[in-house]
Amino acid sequence: MALVKLKPTSAGRRGMVKVVNPDLYKGRPHDALTEKKTSKAGRNNSGRVTVRHQGGGHKMHYRVIDFRRNKDGIAAKVERIEYDPNRSANIALLCYADGERRYIIAPRGVEVGQQLMSGAEAPIKAGNALPIRNIPVGSTIHCVEMMPGKGAQIARAAGTSVQLLAREGAYAQLRLRSGEIRRVHVECRATIGEVGNEEHSLRKIGKAGANRWRGIRPTVRGVAMNPVDHPHGGGEGRTGEGRVPVSPWGTPAKGYRTRRNKRTDNMIVQRRHKR
Protein backbone atom coordinates (compact mmCIF):
# COMPACT_ATOMS: atom_id res chain seq x y z
CA MET A 1 0.00 0.00 0.00
CA ALA A 2 1.38 3.38 -1.01
CA LEU A 3 0.41 7.02 -1.38
CA VAL A 4 0.70 8.27 -4.97
CA LYS A 5 0.75 11.99 -5.75
CA LEU A 6 -0.66 12.46 -9.23
CA LYS A 7 0.97 14.69 -11.83
CA PRO A 8 -0.85 18.01 -12.46
CA THR A 9 -2.13 17.07 -15.92
CA SER A 10 -5.36 18.96 -15.13
CA ALA A 11 -6.65 21.32 -12.45
CA GLY A 12 -8.53 18.46 -10.78
CA ARG A 13 -5.50 16.17 -10.59
CA ARG A 14 -3.17 18.87 -9.23
CA GLY A 15 -2.63 18.04 -5.56
CA MET A 16 -4.62 14.79 -5.72
CA VAL A 17 -3.16 12.00 -3.58
CA LYS A 18 -4.44 8.43 -3.95
CA VAL A 19 -3.96 5.31 -1.83
CA VAL A 20 -2.78 2.53 -4.13
CA ASN A 21 -2.85 -1.08 -2.96
CA PRO A 22 -1.77 -3.57 -5.64
CA ASP A 23 -2.74 -6.49 -3.38
CA LEU A 24 -6.48 -5.71 -3.58
CA TYR A 25 -8.62 -8.22 -5.48
CA LYS A 26 -9.66 -6.78 -8.85
CA GLY A 27 -12.69 -8.98 -9.58
CA ARG A 28 -16.33 -8.85 -8.54
CA PRO A 29 -17.36 -9.33 -4.89
CA HIS A 30 -18.68 -12.68 -3.65
CA ASP A 31 -22.28 -12.73 -4.94
CA ALA A 32 -23.75 -14.63 -1.97
CA LEU A 33 -22.52 -11.89 0.39
CA THR A 34 -23.79 -8.86 -1.53
CA GLU A 35 -27.15 -7.13 -1.25
CA LYS A 36 -28.97 -4.39 -3.11
CA LYS A 37 -28.38 -0.93 -1.65
CA THR A 38 -31.00 1.71 -2.39
CA SER A 39 -29.89 5.33 -2.46
CA LYS A 40 -32.05 7.50 -0.18
CA ALA A 41 -30.38 10.82 -1.11
CA GLY A 42 -30.85 12.00 2.49
CA ARG A 43 -34.67 11.71 2.34
CA ASN A 44 -37.02 10.01 4.78
CA ASN A 45 -40.17 8.01 3.99
CA SER A 46 -42.14 11.19 3.26
CA GLY A 47 -39.53 12.44 0.80
CA ARG A 48 -38.22 15.29 2.94
CA VAL A 49 -34.52 15.97 3.38
CA THR A 50 -33.46 14.79 6.85
CA VAL A 51 -29.71 14.60 6.15
CA ARG A 52 -28.20 17.40 4.10
CA HIS A 53 -25.38 17.09 1.56
CA GLN A 54 -26.31 13.61 0.32
CA GLY A 55 -27.42 12.53 -3.14
CA GLY A 56 -26.19 11.21 -6.47
CA GLY A 57 -23.04 9.13 -6.53
CA HIS A 58 -22.16 5.83 -8.10
CA LYS A 59 -24.48 2.88 -7.60
CA MET A 60 -23.15 0.49 -4.93
CA HIS A 61 -23.86 -2.99 -3.64
CA TYR A 62 -23.71 -3.62 0.10
CA ARG A 63 -21.21 -6.25 1.29
CA VAL A 64 -22.58 -8.29 4.21
CA ILE A 65 -19.89 -8.13 6.92
CA ASP A 66 -19.58 -10.65 9.76
CA PHE A 67 -19.35 -8.32 12.76
CA ARG A 68 -20.22 -11.06 15.27
CA ARG A 69 -17.32 -13.43 14.46
CA ASN A 70 -19.27 -16.25 16.13
CA LYS A 71 -18.04 -19.21 14.05
CA ASP A 72 -15.88 -20.63 16.83
CA GLY A 73 -13.15 -23.23 16.65
CA ILE A 74 -13.09 -23.51 12.84
CA ALA A 75 -10.01 -22.30 11.00
CA ALA A 76 -10.54 -19.85 8.16
CA LYS A 77 -8.15 -18.95 5.34
CA VAL A 78 -7.96 -15.40 4.02
CA GLU A 79 -8.98 -15.89 0.40
CA ARG A 80 -8.58 -12.28 -0.74
CA ILE A 81 -8.56 -8.63 0.36
CA GLU A 82 -11.17 -6.44 -1.35
CA TYR A 83 -12.16 -2.80 -1.69
CA ASP A 84 -15.50 -1.91 -0.10
CA PRO A 85 -17.20 1.29 -1.33
CA ASN A 86 -19.42 1.39 1.78
CA ARG A 87 -16.62 2.02 4.31
CA SER A 88 -13.11 3.41 4.66
CA ALA A 89 -11.57 0.05 5.62
CA ASN A 90 -10.87 -2.80 3.22
CA ILE A 91 -12.56 -6.15 3.75
CA ALA A 92 -11.19 -9.71 3.78
CA LEU A 93 -13.04 -12.74 2.42
CA LEU A 94 -12.58 -15.73 4.74
CA CYS A 95 -13.08 -19.31 3.57
CA TYR A 96 -13.76 -21.62 6.54
CA ALA A 97 -12.74 -25.27 6.67
CA ASP A 98 -16.39 -26.32 6.21
CA GLY A 99 -16.66 -24.28 2.99
CA GLU A 100 -18.60 -21.28 4.32
CA ARG A 101 -17.39 -17.83 3.30
CA ARG A 102 -17.72 -14.60 5.28
CA TYR A 103 -16.46 -11.04 4.94
CA ILE A 104 -14.69 -9.33 7.85
CA ILE A 105 -13.03 -5.94 8.28
CA ALA A 106 -9.45 -6.45 7.07
CA PRO A 107 -7.00 -6.01 9.99
CA ARG A 108 -3.60 -4.41 9.50
CA GLY A 109 -0.92 -6.91 8.50
CA VAL A 110 -3.29 -9.75 7.56
CA GLU A 111 -2.35 -11.24 4.19
CA VAL A 112 -3.88 -13.60 1.65
CA GLY A 113 -3.41 -17.25 2.65
CA GLN A 114 -3.18 -16.53 6.37
CA GLN A 115 -5.17 -18.65 8.85
CA LEU A 116 -7.57 -16.88 11.23
CA MET A 117 -9.84 -18.18 13.98
CA SER A 118 -12.47 -16.93 16.41
CA GLY A 119 -13.52 -18.17 19.84
CA ALA A 120 -12.22 -18.26 23.40
CA GLU A 121 -9.43 -20.69 22.47
CA ALA A 122 -8.13 -18.71 19.48
CA PRO A 123 -4.44 -17.71 19.69
CA ILE A 124 -3.55 -14.07 20.36
CA LYS A 125 -2.59 -12.82 16.91
CA ALA A 126 -3.82 -10.10 14.55
CA GLY A 127 -7.17 -10.92 12.97
CA ASN A 128 -8.37 -13.45 15.55
CA ALA A 129 -11.57 -12.63 17.48
CA LEU A 130 -11.95 -13.50 21.17
CA PRO A 131 -14.05 -12.50 24.17
CA ILE A 132 -12.37 -9.60 26.00
CA ARG A 133 -11.89 -11.79 29.11
CA ASN A 134 -9.41 -13.89 27.07
CA ILE A 135 -7.42 -10.93 25.69
CA PRO A 136 -4.29 -9.76 27.59
CA VAL A 137 -4.54 -6.35 29.25
CA GLY A 138 -2.70 -3.70 27.24
CA SER A 139 -3.55 -5.28 23.88
CA THR A 140 -4.57 -3.23 20.85
CA ILE A 141 -7.95 -4.37 19.55
CA HIS A 142 -10.64 -3.31 17.08
CA CYS A 143 -14.19 -4.26 16.01
CA VAL A 144 -15.34 -4.29 19.64
CA GLU A 145 -18.88 -5.20 20.69
CA MET A 146 -20.79 -2.93 23.09
CA MET A 147 -23.19 -5.73 24.07
CA PRO A 148 -22.35 -9.46 23.99
CA GLY A 149 -23.53 -11.03 20.74
CA LYS A 150 -24.73 -7.77 19.17
CA GLY A 151 -21.81 -7.44 16.76
CA ALA A 152 -18.89 -5.03 16.56
CA GLN A 153 -19.70 -1.33 16.91
CA ILE A 154 -16.47 0.30 18.13
CA ALA A 155 -13.28 0.88 16.05
CA ARG A 156 -14.41 -0.26 12.61
CA ALA A 157 -13.05 2.58 10.43
CA ALA A 158 -9.71 2.48 8.59
CA GLY A 159 -6.67 2.76 10.86
CA THR A 160 -8.66 2.78 14.11
CA SER A 161 -8.01 0.75 17.25
CA VAL A 162 -8.81 0.59 20.97
CA GLN A 163 -6.53 -0.21 23.91
CA LEU A 164 -7.63 -2.64 26.61
CA LEU A 165 -6.66 -0.87 29.84
CA ALA A 166 -7.99 -3.08 32.63
CA ARG A 167 -10.46 -5.77 33.69
CA GLU A 168 -12.50 -5.39 36.87
CA GLY A 169 -15.02 -8.13 37.57
CA ALA A 170 -17.56 -8.41 34.78
CA TYR A 171 -16.37 -5.30 32.95
CA ALA A 172 -13.28 -4.14 31.09
CA GLN A 173 -12.05 -0.59 30.50
CA LEU A 174 -11.15 0.54 26.99
CA ARG A 175 -9.42 3.71 25.83
CA LEU A 176 -10.96 4.85 22.55
CA ARG A 177 -9.19 6.89 19.88
CA SER A 178 -11.13 9.97 20.99
CA GLY A 179 -9.58 9.71 24.48
CA GLU A 180 -12.80 8.47 26.06
CA ILE A 181 -12.45 5.63 28.57
CA ARG A 182 -15.43 3.30 28.43
CA ARG A 183 -16.56 0.11 30.17
CA VAL A 184 -17.79 -2.93 28.22
CA HIS A 185 -18.72 -6.43 29.39
CA VAL A 186 -15.90 -8.98 29.34
CA GLU A 187 -18.04 -11.36 27.26
CA CYS A 188 -18.07 -8.82 24.40
CA ARG A 189 -15.89 -9.91 21.51
CA ALA A 190 -13.06 -7.98 19.91
CA THR A 191 -10.53 -8.61 17.16
CA ILE A 192 -6.79 -8.46 17.87
CA GLY A 193 -4.81 -5.70 16.15
CA GLU A 194 -5.95 -2.55 14.41
CA VAL A 195 -7.96 -1.93 11.26
CA GLY A 196 -5.95 -1.84 8.03
CA ASN A 197 -5.86 0.78 5.25
CA GLU A 198 -4.38 3.19 7.79
CA GLU A 199 -3.27 5.62 5.04
CA HIS A 200 -6.89 6.37 4.13
CA SER A 201 -6.85 9.64 6.10
CA LEU A 202 -3.83 10.91 4.11
CA ARG A 203 -5.52 10.85 0.71
CA LYS A 204 -6.53 14.12 -0.97
CA ILE A 205 -9.74 14.18 -2.98
CA GLY A 206 -8.37 16.74 -5.47
CA LYS A 207 -11.65 17.87 -7.03
CA ALA A 208 -15.31 18.34 -6.18
CA GLY A 209 -16.36 15.69 -8.69
CA ALA A 210 -14.60 12.96 -6.70
CA ASN A 211 -16.89 13.71 -3.77
CA ARG A 212 -19.92 13.67 -6.08
CA TRP A 213 -18.93 10.14 -7.13
CA ARG A 214 -19.19 9.23 -3.45
CA GLY A 215 -22.68 10.70 -3.11
CA ILE A 216 -21.56 13.84 -1.24
CA ARG A 217 -23.22 17.08 -2.35
CA PRO A 218 -21.85 20.61 -1.76
CA THR A 219 -21.91 22.23 1.68
CA VAL A 220 -22.92 25.90 1.63
CA ARG A 221 -21.70 28.13 4.48
CA GLY A 222 -24.36 29.71 6.64
CA VAL A 223 -22.81 33.20 6.32
CA ALA A 224 -23.27 32.96 2.54
CA MET A 225 -27.05 32.47 2.92
CA ASN A 226 -29.93 34.84 3.52
CA PRO A 227 -31.40 35.35 7.01
CA VAL A 228 -34.45 33.28 6.06
CA ASP A 229 -32.22 30.26 5.38
CA HIS A 230 -29.73 30.30 8.25
CA PRO A 231 -29.11 32.13 11.57
CA HIS A 232 -25.70 33.26 10.20
CA GLY A 233 -27.22 34.69 7.02
CA GLY A 234 -27.63 38.26 5.86
CA GLY A 235 -25.55 41.41 6.21
CA GLU A 236 -24.01 43.73 3.65
CA GLY A 237 -20.86 42.38 2.07
CA ARG A 238 -18.74 39.76 3.80
CA THR A 239 -19.61 39.33 7.45
CA GLY A 240 -18.91 36.93 10.28
CA GLU A 241 -21.50 34.95 12.20
CA GLY A 242 -22.06 37.84 14.61
CA ARG A 243 -23.06 35.36 17.31
CA VAL A 244 -22.16 31.97 18.75
CA PRO A 245 -21.87 29.57 15.77
CA VAL A 246 -25.03 27.49 15.44
CA SER A 247 -26.61 24.93 13.13
CA PRO A 248 -29.40 25.94 10.72
CA TRP A 249 -31.84 25.05 13.52
CA GLY A 250 -30.14 27.13 16.22
CA THR A 251 -28.25 24.40 18.09
CA PRO A 252 -24.72 25.51 19.13
CA ALA A 253 -22.30 24.10 16.58
CA LYS A 254 -18.89 23.97 18.26
CA GLY A 255 -18.27 21.97 21.42
CA TYR A 256 -21.90 21.75 22.52
CA ARG A 257 -22.70 18.40 24.13
CA THR A 258 -25.64 16.61 22.54
CA ARG A 259 -25.42 13.23 24.29
CA ARG A 260 -28.77 12.37 25.90
CA ASN A 261 -28.48 8.64 26.70
CA LYS A 262 -28.62 8.55 30.51
CA ARG A 263 -29.15 4.78 30.47
CA THR A 264 -25.51 4.14 29.51
CA ASP A 265 -23.87 7.12 31.25
CA ASN A 266 -22.44 4.79 33.90
CA MET A 267 -20.46 2.96 31.19
CA ILE A 268 -18.36 6.06 30.45
CA VAL A 269 -15.50 6.34 32.95
CA GLN A 270 -13.95 9.46 31.40
CA ARG A 271 -15.45 11.69 28.73
CA ARG A 272 -13.40 12.58 25.68
CA HIS A 273 -13.89 16.22 26.70
CA LYS A 274 -11.48 16.84 29.57
CA ARG A 275 -13.55 19.81 30.85
UniProtKB/Swiss-Prot annotation:
GO terms for biological process: cytoplasmic translation. One of its GO terms (cellular component) is large ribosomal subunit. Keywords: Ribonucleoprotein, Ribosomal protein, RNA-binding, rRNA-binding. SUPFAM superfamilies: Nucleic acid-binding proteins, Translation proteins SH3-like domain. Residues 25-38, 229-241 have a biased composition (Basic and acidic residues). Residues 24-54, 223-275 are annotated as: Disordered. PROSITE patterns: RIBOSOMAL_L2. It comes from the Bacteria. Pfam families: Ribosomal_L2 (PF00181), Ribosomal_L2_C (PF03947). The keyword Plastid does not apply. The keyword RNA-binding applies. One of its GO terms (molecular function) is transferase activity. Belongs to the universal ribosomal protein uL2 family. Part of the 50S ribosomal subunit. Forms a bridge to the 30S subunit in the 70S ribosome. One of the primary rRNA binding proteins. Required for association of the 30S and 50S subunits to form the 70S ribosome, for tRNA binding and peptide bond formation. It has been suggested to have peptidyltransferase activity; this is somewhat controversial. Makes several contacts with the 16S rRNA in the 70S ribosome. This is Large ribosomal subunit protein uL2. It comes from Azoarcus sp. (strain BH72). The lineage of its organism: Bacteria, Pseudomonadati, Pseudomonadota, Betaproteobacteria, Rhodocyclales. The gene is rplB.
